[in-house]
Amino acid sequence: TWSACGYGDGCSPEPEKELTILSCGHYRLLRLEKLHTVRIQGRRDWQLLYVAKARATFPPAGGAGKTGERCGVSPWRAQDYFYLLKEAPEIYWIHFTGERAEGLLEEWGLFHGHSCFVGEQDRYLRCFEEIIQELQLQPPGFQRLCALRFEELLLSMGRQRLRLKNPQLAGDSLVIQV
């Protein structure tokens, strides 16, 4: 398994704070046949998974998450998901907490349901990679920048989801021809 992870050392899940990014990472299976995660009692924070390549399996209710899908897990919810080497998955994940967490997910239509298709965009990967780097290096202001990048990620996913649901919005990007 190859991974790049960043942890907000000293950041404890404090739901009373507005938004705190606790950890973020990127998995790619190289040799391990199956990476299986089971958390019977869940975690005390929120989690968002994004399938950047191939697929992940979220049994029993979630089914298979394919490229371009995101899966959200609320606090204390049981978790059971796995990735298989033969499917060559590439997954980004982030754990977060705070008073605004649920509201941000709901605002962009990413709260209800276990998973939803948000498409493939380089912007998502850049947001994840920047958050990972900030958590690894921890320069001054890293927590605030991580929260801002995460909000950008959610906004981008929510906006893309709206475009996919409503074809009339697909052309709402500004196009400049020279």
PLM feature spans:
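Hydrophobic recognition helices of helix-based DNA-binding modules
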Residues: L135, L154-M157, R161
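A short, acidic/glycine-rich surface segment
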Residues: L30-T37, D80-Y81, E102, L164
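Short acidic-glycine-tyrosine-enriched beta hairpin
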Residues: G62-W76
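Ligand-binding loop in jelly-roll beta-barrel domains
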Residues: R43, R77-R100
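Short, solvent-exposed positions on alpha-helices
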Residues: P140-L148
